[in-house]
Every structure is written in C-alpha cells, then in structure tokens.
A protein has these predicted regions:
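Bacterial Sec-dependent signal peptides at the C-terminal "C-region" and cleavage site
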Residues: 13-20
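Hydrophobic N-terminal alpha-helices or hydrophobic patches in metabolic proteins across all domains
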Residues: 21-144
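Sec-dependent signal peptide recognition
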Residues: 4-9
Length: 144
C-alpha cells in the first residue's frame, strides 16, 4: 500500500512539473507542433542501455500534436527554424540494440534529402546505428 501511495505521489509531481514547463507552439500548414527543445538548448536523457546522455540541439525538436506515430506516441519532428523549404522528410529510426524499427522522425525546413539527413545525424554520435533510412513524403502522408 505504501508503494502505491508513493507511486501516485510521484506521478502527481511529474504531472505538476510537466504542466509548468513553457513549451513553444508553432504551426506547420495548420498542424500544431509543440517544441520541447529549441535550437541552442541541451536535450538530455538515459539511453536503452542505462547510460546518461546530453546533446546540444542544432534545430528545434518536438512533436506534432494529435498525430501519432507508429509507436502510438506523438510524431517527433526536427524543425529548421531558418529553413524556407516546404519539403517533408521522414527518417526511419532503428532500435540501436535490436536494429529493428523504432519510430519515425519528421524533418521540416530542410531543402534537400541530404540536408535533412545531416540535420538528424548531427544530434547523434559518430557511427550512430539508429539511422534506418530517409524518404521524402507528401503532406497528405504526414497528416493521415
């Protein structure tokens, strides 16, 4: 019973903390995007092997509101705030341990497929094995 109370209290504190964060909201062709990490900030976490990591963000990073990815979570997006291109690129990210499909990452504001690929890879260590490919997609494919 004590563990359950502690768990509920922890969830409540996480909810309060998360709701106090001031995320930037932008829109792409009418689709709302929440920017969790702006260009120039530092993103951090713990990888699947339990190792802490941190990464300076060279582009905005967030997610599309109300668009779920294949992993049933909001679809992640890297957004180049200085870019003028309307092209949409989709990265296939692999699980680094199993090398199987993990999730998609959308790249916005990049003019070429190579720019989008480099915009993704710059956020990962050299030799990153989580990159599974990139393709240009249509707005219709994105918004369905």
């Amino acid at each position: 019973m004590q563990v359950k109370r502690l768990f509920v209290a922890l969830l409540f504190l996480l909810f309060v903390f998360y709701s106090c964060l001031d995320f930037t909201e932008v829109s792409y062709r009418g689709l709302p995007i929440t920017i969790e990490y702006e260009k120039g900030t530092v993103r951090s976490g713990i990888d699947k092997e339990g190792n802490p990591w941190q990464q300076e963000m060279f582009y905005h990073y967030g997610y599309f509101n109300n668009i779920l990815g294949e992993d049933c979570e909001e679809l992640d997006v890297y957004y180049n705030p200085d870019g003028k291109s309307d092209k949409i690129f989709r990265i296939t990210q692999l699980d680094v341990l199993t090398k199987e499909f993990d999730e998609y990452k959308i790249m916005l504001g990049f003019s070429t497929i190579e720019d989008a690929k480099q915009g993704y890879l710059v956020h990962y260590p050299d030799g990153w094995v989580g990159f599974g490919g990139i393709e240009e997609i249509s707005f219709k494919d994105l918004s369905k």
